[in-house]
Amino acid sequence: MKLIFALLLLVPVIANAAEDKVAVYLNFEQAYLSNDVSLFAPLLSKNYTIRQTLHIPGIGSDTVPVTKAQLLEGMKQNPKPSSLPRSKAESVKIETISKQQFCASSQTLDQVVVAGKNYEEKELRKACFNHKNNRYEAISHTIDVYYREL
């Protein structure tokens, strides 16, 4: 009986930890899509990297790795917020890597027009975080963009 009671007390703690990680990811994504360096830079680890891959039907894939410095400079040059759709909390999946690290992934769908044709644009986003100095820092970030003609 004591074991059941202990488990009932532990389940909300585990659920709250997962919700907190979802909030960490959503805050990170919002700062990234804001293109505001003052919001985004403090969330990044020293060696943060981002890699974006475009998957174009009938053509192939192209991956662009970008350093932290390159990304922040690009944000400074174009500080206008992105119009890309934001992730919803219910679409964020958390993967615990260790006591100090986790990764969060999400998916968004949008419709875009390219060369006069309508496409579905699906983004698979993943960011990994490390807990350091009482906060989470993003250590890596990948975005896979898939297009499908409608």
Predicted regions and their residues:
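Generic short beta-strand segments
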Residues: 49-51, 106-112
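Short beta-strand edge/turn micro-motifs at domain boundaries
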Residues: 101, 118-150
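Hydrophobic/aromatic beta-strand elements that line small-molecule binding cavities or substrate pockets
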Residues: 71, 89-95, 108-110, 122-131
